[in-house]
Structure formats: structure tokens, C-alpha cells
Curated annotation (Swiss-Prot):
Its EC number is 2.7.1.33. It catalyses: (R)-pantothenate + ATP = (R)-4'-phosphopantothenate + ADP + H(+). Its cofactor is NH4(+); K(+). The active site is at residue 109. Pathway: Cofactor biosynthesis; coenzyme A biosynthesis; CoA from (R)-pantothenate: step 1/5. The keyword Nucleotide-binding applies. Belongs to the type III pantothenate kinase family. SUPFAM superfamilies: Actin-like ATPase domain (SSF53067). K(+) binds at residue 129. Disulfide bonds: none annotated. This is Type III pantothenate kinase.
Length: 258
């Protein structure tokens, strides 16, 4: 079995693959202050609840956009699993040709998503990841990573609104009954959701203008389904795209792989 760990700024998603299939998955809050023992105890609890044992894990791969957490995670892997984890970064074989001014600037999450999307859906592609930041990645018909856009995520945009406006409350991110809000909460929900849908449609449309062939649009991340339900510009929602990319990259880098 393969343990895959995707560390985001807000959430960490953990999965277990068996024979190329995602068998188990969990989402936890990202904590920059957990020790290797706290991570180990947390994983032991998740494993025991699912009837898994640490001894069943034969490999581990991690992608992270939060560098401070990596020391504890790597120590946890060696202490509790007795495995040196693969870590997505420079020097790994991803099979991705990155046409960025400085390829090292491309986040691990964006690389992993692109690798999975190309293998699953072909190219050209636009991959939209609704995370703490919303990222847009364009892959051309030659499977080259050409670049993209980074925007504030819907959650931090919402937090900025109520934290900077004294009379506006903290609200749930949800679809209002009507775009024309009849109270403060529904008006905020309307502005946030439909404003964000407009952002997605606008950026995707402009990327398509520059594409030489019509790209397929793949969405992932916690709020992908909410946005996709309000827009016809998203072709496919794949909630486990990042985990699949980690599994693919692990296979490309494991000892003995040709």
C-alpha cells in the first residue's frame, strides 16, 4: 500500500492507495506546530478506525506548500513507518515539461495536479484548484505546462470581507436562494459565490483565447463542486486529482521503475 500526503495551507489530505486504487482518504486541518509524534498518533487513530496497520504501508510520498511542516512529517515517516518518504520537488521525475520563467517557482500542488490531469484526461487542459488560493494552470496540446494564474481563494476572500467591514458577519459559503439578496447574509453569499463564478469564467475564457486548441477544464479542491454547479465552463470535477498525481509521481520515481 502507498500513503500519499498533500499538505495545503488550510487542509492536509491523506490517502492510501492499493494496486493503483484510492482505498481510503481523510482531510485534516493543516497544523504548522504538530510534532512527529502528534502526526504519528493522528495517523494511527485514522488507520485503526479504518482497520489499517502501519506495517501495510510500503511507500510514502508527500507534496507540501507549507515548508515548516516538512521536518516533522519526514521524521514521522521514518519513526512510525520506517520509510524514507518521497517529497515532490526539484530533481523528481514528473514527466512534466515546465515552461515557466523559473520552473522552481511552480508549487508542488500545481505540478502534481498537472501530472494527474494529463494522464487522466489528455491535453490541452486548464486545471483549476480551489484551495486557500485558487490556481489556474494551462497545459498545451503538447502536454507542456505553460503557466497560469493565482487568485485569492473563496474562503480567504470571505474572511477579508467580514474582518474589514465591521457590520458584516461571518457567513457560511453556500448558494443563496436568489442572486438578489433580501438580507445581509444572502446578499453576501450572492456576492461571494456569483462573483467568484464570474472570476472563474472570466479567467478561463481569457486562457481559452490564447489556446491554439480548445482545452478541457478540470476542477479540483474543496469548493470545486459548488462552483461547477453554477457554471458551464467547468467540464469535469475531480476531487482526488492531487492524490492521484502523487500516486503517479511515486510510481515514476520508485526504485526499479523503468
Amino acid at each position: 500500500m502507498l500513503l500519499v500526503i498533500d499538505v495545503g495551507n488550510t487542509n492536509t489530505v491523506i490517502g492510501v492507495y492499493h494496486d493503483g486504487e484510492l482505498e481510503y482518504h481523510w482531510r485534516i486541518e493543516t497544523s504548522r506546530h504538530k510534532t512527529e509524534d502528534e502526526f504519528g498518533m493522528l495517523l494511527r487513530s485514522l488507520f485503526e478506525h479504518s482497520g489499517l496497520m502501519f506495517e501495510q504501508i510500503e511507500g510514502i510520498i508527500i507534496s507540501s506548500v507549507v515548508p515548516p511542516i516538512m521536518f516533522s512529517l519526514e521524521r514521522m515517516c521514518t519513526k512510525y513507518f520506517h520509510i524514507e518518504p518521497q517529497v515532490v520537488g526539484p530533481g523528481m521525475k514528473t514527466g512534466l515539461n515546465i515552461k515557466y520563467d523559473n520552473p522552481k517557482e511552480v508549487g508542488a500542488d500545481r505540478i502534481v495536479n498537472a501530472v494527474a490531469a494529463i494522464q487522466q484526461y489528455g491535453a490541452p487542459l486548464i486545471v483549476v484548484d480551489f484551495g486557500t488560493a485558487t490556481t489556474y494552470c494551462y497545459i498545451d496540446e503538447n502536454k507542456q505546462y505553460m503557466g497560469g494564474a493565482i487568485a485569492p481563494g473563496i474562503t480567504i476572500s470571505t474572511e477579508a470581507l467580514y474582518s474589514r467591514a465591521a457590520k458584516l458577519p461571518r457567513i457560511e459559503i453556500a448558494r443563496p436562494d436568489n442572486i438578489i439578496g433580501k438580507n445581509t447574509v444572502s446578499a453576501m453569499q450572492s456576492g461571494i459565490l456569483f462573483g467568484y463564478v464570474g472570476q472563474v469564467e472570466g479567467i478561463v475564457k481569457r486562457m481559452k483565447w490564447q489556446a491554439t486548441q480548445e482545452p478541457k477544464v478540470i476542477a479540483t479542491g474543496g469548493l470545486a463542486s459548488l462552483i461547477a454547479n453554477e457554471s458551464d465552463c467547468i467540464d469535469i470535477v475531480d476531487p482526488f486529482l492531487t492524490l492521484k498525481g502523487l500516486e503517479i509521481i511515486y510510481e515514476r520515481n520508485r526504485v526499479g521503475h523503468v
